[in-house]
Amino acid sequence: MIKTKKELQFIQFVKDECKKHNVKCSLRPSKYVIMDGNVKCSGWFDEEVPELVVATNRPDWIEILAHEYGHLTQWVEQVPIWKKAEVSLGKVWEWLDGKNCRSIQKHIGVARDLELDNEKRAVKIIKKFGLKVDLEHYVKKANAYVQFYNWMLITRRWSKPKNSPYKNKNLVNAMSSKFNMKYDPLTPKLEKIFQTENI
């Protein structure tokens, strides 16, 4: 995939920031990357290793890189929602693996709010670096991803890679192009779309 000058500058910036904070930067030429538990995804940031990983053989790779770099900034800045999520994310993954968890609604809410904060950061990053991304569409996809956390509370499962919330056209089209939605709880209208689309 040919990269633009601005994309190359952004990649270098992310690599430099990763080096500065002793984070391994792994940009992999694949469509998906595999997380613990054999979960396919497009990327992640893990503060424990620490490592930033992005699958780059996909059309939305630059958006994913902006998103994962946004998580790195949350960690570096130690924003309050990041600190809360240090406990909650582990609880959410344990719950998805079948373990009972008290207060799962609270923990999923923290994970959702972490992603909402991060999606807003990603939009600022995309604008700052002048990356070629349709921001209205990106925000719709971001809203679908954030709302997915509410749906996950109902289904107790992660989405399938081929039918993820940000890839499902009907779900994305139902989202706002601004970060102005009701994020808690899932509205009946959106719940019906998630159910109909089998996400």
Predicted regions mapped to residue ranges:
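Alpha-helix boundary/N-cap detector
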Residues: I2-K5, Q9, D113, H137
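Active-site scaffold of zinc-dependent metalloenzymes
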Residues: T4-E7, Q12-W61, Y69-V76, W82
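An active-site-proximal "capping" alpha-helix that borders the catalytic cofactor pocket
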Residues: A111-K128
